Amino acid sequence: MYRKLFFALVVIALCLLCAVSSLAQTTTLTPAERENALKNLQATHDAFLQSISGLSEKQWKFKPAPDRWSVAEVSEHITVTESAIFGMLQKQVMTSPAAPEKRAEVAGKDEKILQIVPDRSHKAQAPEFLQPTGRWANRADTTNAFEAARRTTMDYVRTTNDDLRDHFGPHPLLGPLDGYLWILLISAHSERHTKQIEEVKADPNFPKD
């Protein structure tokens, strides 16, 4: 009887060890990481919508120069890029093999992404597939598309248990980024181009109404 009890206890102990080991290997966002990502997504959502609020058709389409984007074009770029980054995160980054050994390569990049990307003194050329082509007819349609894209991003961040820190994808300028950094890049990119919208609005030839 004691032998059976002993073996039963051993089996239970092994099961508990396996369960603990499994939990230890499962990593997801910490509460602080989730809160930080959502805070930045919400802040840049609000700032962008505020920057385009109340613009007339003339203001919406005004170009400071032939080779510079209008508010409409910048807004389209923000929206298209968000959808592209989120799609790549889902279809490429998170389907790549987990590589926790790469974590050291991206250590400290959280704050760098949020500081460097919005800095308009660093110039970069958007790839052709992310450039504006007039995908939406007006400000309302563009706004609706942006709202839908941002809602998808924020819903994912709010609810996901994906292992965002152990899956990586290369960025042509920023190097390897884990899944969480790609999320931060969405908000940092929005901030960068919201600043660009403010530059357009500050142009001396920007329509008064």
Residue ranges and their predicted role:
Residues 40, 109-164:
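Acidic/histidine-rich alpha-helical segments that form the ligand environment
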Residues 26-44:
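Short N-terminal segments immediately surrounding and downstream of signal-peptide cleavage
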Residues 1-5:
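Positively charged n-region of N-terminal signal peptides that target proteins for export
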